[in-house]
Amino acid sequence: MNPLLDAHNLTHHFETLLYENLSLSVNEGESIAILGVSGSGKSTILNNLSTLLPPKKGRVSLLGINDIYALSAKEQLSLRRLQLGIVFQAHYLFRGFSGIENLKVASILSGESIDKEILESFDIAKVVHQPIGQLSGGQQQRLSIARVLTKKPKIIFADEPTGNLDKQTATRVMEIMFEYIRTHKGALVLATHDQDIAQSCDRIYHLYDRALHRVK
């Protein structure tokens, strides 16, 4: 079986070296958690893997594409819109829109319809018509994940997706995401500091000493 994602010898640095010669593959139906302290490079890895930030060295293969950074900017944008789901820590919802309008943007760009069952599952169906500014941090976080699932992506990259959620809600949200990748034969790559959330994934890696160390 060919992996959905295959990263080879990634190296990245800003002022200092974050990691070097990092390799990772993710298969259909798999969930991967990356643990690490703040500033260790977890978010940067997700950005490298999802076309948002080219690594300084190395190659990323996604969904049969040998090197995603050999694509044009337009082709990378199309890949993100149609095949990838990215859950940002800061949500990046359109502030001037209501919740449902944010979902409609994802629906239009991907050609997929809004799934009302997802809204019910995330307990946001009753508030989805309110302006973003009137939603709590937890509601915004759930809405941002619902927006990603609306696109029906093949691979989901999630950066601290449960950071604003209580433990019970976080568990429920992760169950929905796991069910999604099983049903749609997709994959999930998760960056988190939450040990409990990480333990629910198929594999766990700890980022330290400039490398990924498998712990599960």
Task: Indicate where each model-derived feature is located.
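Conserved ABC transporter NBD signature motif
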Residues: 58-67
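Conserved catalytic motifs of ABC-family nucleotide-binding domains
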Residues: 152
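Catalytic Walker B motif of ABC-type/P-loop ATPase nucleotide-binding domains
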Residues: 156-159
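Conserved ABC ATPase "signature" region
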Residues: 67, 112-127
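Conserved ABC ATPase signature
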Residues: 131-135, 139-141
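ABC ATPase NBD coupling module
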Residues: 67-85
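Helix-to-loop junction immediately C-terminal to a conserved catalytic motif
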Residues: 50
